Amino acid sequence: MEIPGKCTSEEIRLTLTSSFMMGNHCFILLIIISSVFLTVFAIRKLWKNNIFPNCTRTLLFSAIINGVVHHWSIAGIRIRTVYRALVYGSDRCSILFQSSECLIESNLYYYTNLFSSLCCISLFFDRLLSLNAKTSYNTKHFSKIFLLFQSISPFGILYWIFYDSVYTGFVPMCSYPPATSSLKFHKVNEFRLYILGTFFVLSFVIFFYNRTQEKGIIHNVYDTESRYKSYENLLATRAVCIIIATQITCLVTTASTTEILSAYKSSIPNTILLPSIAFMTGLTYSNFFLPIIIIYQTNRIINQRYNAIKRIQNEKSFATHFASLDLSWKSSKIDNSS
């Protein structure tokens, strides 16, 4: 939403200084502050408990760090908006931001958005390659490729979106793109949702395939190491599926709600429309849930791995016990015959 002139309407000025909008800023900042504490616990969990495969673990660290940077950019944008509303709230010609004032925050905000989605794609291919245990996949080589992919690709996408942008317009918040780039920006967002939706479905296909494969190994393979690796892959794939599902759910829900609100904007006053749309920050919620998922899945995997190891050990003891009984029965039979 870009406004061509420096001075906005009285309705938008009242909206930007309304208690509804201020409550929105406080809510988002509260989400960010809570996420900081959760992120600290999630990093400790990942660092101390080496329960994920090395490449998956590296990608999860990159996702957490990106989430922190994204929240910093959002916090900066929101705090600047609150400050502008408090200081220039009575002047409708000073309350807006010129797009050129938002270059750092907005580009950081868009970069972390794209990085997060590309990280989900990297996690998907990480789990896909892990299906074949005979490959030399478990090396640092692949994690470097994934990190380069999700770190460099956003620069090319952002260049295509903004290379011909004009930053002379005015916006209510620095999270809004310039008007000259808004069409390409929305096209990229729409394409991103379709791509993530596709990988969302494919990730569950991998999970169910992994589950079927793991069940087959249980019944046909008696090597403890093979069975353990198969079970470890299954647990890691399930965690990745949940992370991808959470991001796509948050993004699709907020994007769909924004589209619905925009479709009825003629019948909704700006005092309700703009604050409602400001709540629709899908990646903020997704990055809030990410450390929660990592903490929960880490604890769950630790418990399930412990139970699985215990079960395998019991099975080995059970088999050893009956093997010894069979041996003693055969020896006693020989003694009796002699």
UniProtKB/Swiss-Prot annotation:
Transmembrane segments: 23-43, 59-79, 108-125, 142-162, 188-208, 240-260, 276-296
InterPro entries listed in its UniProt record: 7TM_GPCR_serpentine_rcpt_Sra
Keywords recorded for this protein, A-Z: Membrane, Transmembrane, Transmembrane helix
Main location: membrane
Lipid bilayer topology: Multi-pass membrane protein
Disulfide bonds: none
GO terms classed as biological process: sensory perception of chemical stimulus
Keyword Membrane: yes
A Gene Ontology cellular-component term: membrane
Subcellular location: Membrane
GO MF annotation terms: G protein-coupled receptor activity
Entry's family note: Belongs to the nematode receptor-like protein sra family.
Name the UniProt record assigns to this protein: Serpentine receptor class alpha-31
Lineage: Eukaryota, Metazoa, Ecdysozoa, Nematoda, Chromadorea
Gene behind this protein: sra-31
